[in-house]
Amino acid sequence: MDLQSLTKEELNEMSMVEAAFIVMANKRQPFNFYDLLEEVAKLKGISETEMDERISFLYTDLNLDGRFLTLGDNTWGLRSWYPHEQAEEEITHSAKPAKRRKSGDDDGEEEYDLVDELEEDEFEDLEDELDELADEEDQDGERDDYDEKDDALPGFDEEDGQTLDEED
């Protein structure tokens, strides 16, 4: 669909996500979300206050509509531009910034740890905590859901080792 062929009435009736699709299809390039929002607002003649009220709706619609693909760093493209096999490879992921923290040394050198390593440590700590809780439960002598009667066999008297049918 061409932008010039649309009447003002058709543009007003069109949803924001449809307008975003038309803008991206005609420009044939990925857009930053806020740039796309401005293009859609310009196209539909939406005021800035109305645009601020609708920003979350457009973002939600882009996420739900299967025609759009997030490329990382708040950049959106059309899924049809990327073959299925290449889509995962070409999507850019922003580099996570390294976090700085002071080491305990007096020489003032700084250590740099990547965010991934910190997240991995947090998961290991959580895993250790869960293991400790499980061990405590295992060591706990009481089993709330266990009753010695559960082990008794029906029709068998444990005291003399005879079945109840044999007693005469």
UniProtKB/Swiss-Prot annotation:
Residues covered by the HTH HARE-type domain: 14-81
GO molecular function, one term: DNA-directed RNA polymerase activity
Keyword Repressor listed: no
Disordered: region residues: 87-168
Annotated signal sequence range: none
One cellular-component annotation, GO: DNA-directed RNA polymerase complex
A single GO BP: regulation of DNA-templated transcription
Keywords (A to Z) from UniProt: DNA-directed RNA polymerase, Nucleotidyltransferase, Transcription, Transferase
General function of this protein: Participates in both the initiation and recycling phases of transcription. In the presence of the delta subunit, RNAP displays an increased specificity of transcription, a decreased affinity for nucleic acids, and an increased efficiency of RNA synthesis because of enhanced recycling.
Subunit: RNAP is composed of a core of 2 alpha, a beta and a beta' subunits. The core is associated with a delta subunit and one of several sigma factors.
Family: Belongs to the RpoE family.
Protein name: Probable DNA-directed RNA polymerase subunit delta
Gene: rpoE
